[in-house]
Amino acid sequence: GIEVFSGLLMHEADQQLRVWLTANRNKRTYVTLKWASSLDGRAAANDGTSKWISGPESRTESHQRRAKVDAIMVGTGTVLADDPELTARKPDATLFDHQPLRVIMGERDLPPGARVFNDSAETLQIKSRSIPAALDELYSRGVRHLWVEGGPQLASDFVRQNLVDEF
C-alpha cells in the first residue's frame, strides 16, 4: 500500500502563501508596513527633513520588495514633504518590470506636477482618512498585497487600528 503523511512542511507552506491566505480568509488586502526610524525613534531628522534615514542596503531591499507587491501607499503629507516617485527601481535606477499601483491616502490636494503622477506607474488618490474603506477599495481592485511606507501619521494609524499584517 501507499503510506500518506499530512501536515508536512505546513508552517513553511503557510509562510509562503501568507499574503494570499490572509487576503482571501479576511477578504482584505494584506498589509506590510515599512517602518524606518532614527536612533531616537523619530521618522525625520530634528530639523524636520526626512529624505533618507535608512542606509543604501535598506533602500535597495525596499525597491526589490516594492517590485513584489500590488500597491504601495503613502499619505498626502509624505507626497507634499518629499515628492516621492514611489516606483520600484533597480540599483542602476532603471525600473523593475512590475510597478506597483501608487496609492496616495488623504484629503489634501496635491500639485499636478508631483512625481507620483508621472507615467512610470498608475496612481490612485484615495481622498479619505478611513483606512478600512481604503483597504476595501483596494481589495475590490484586486490588490492583495499593500506596502505602506508612511509617513508617520499614516503608519501610526494602521498600527493603532490593528491593520498591519507584517512589519
Feature map (PLM): residue ranges:
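Short acidic amphipathic segments
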Residues: 154, 158-166
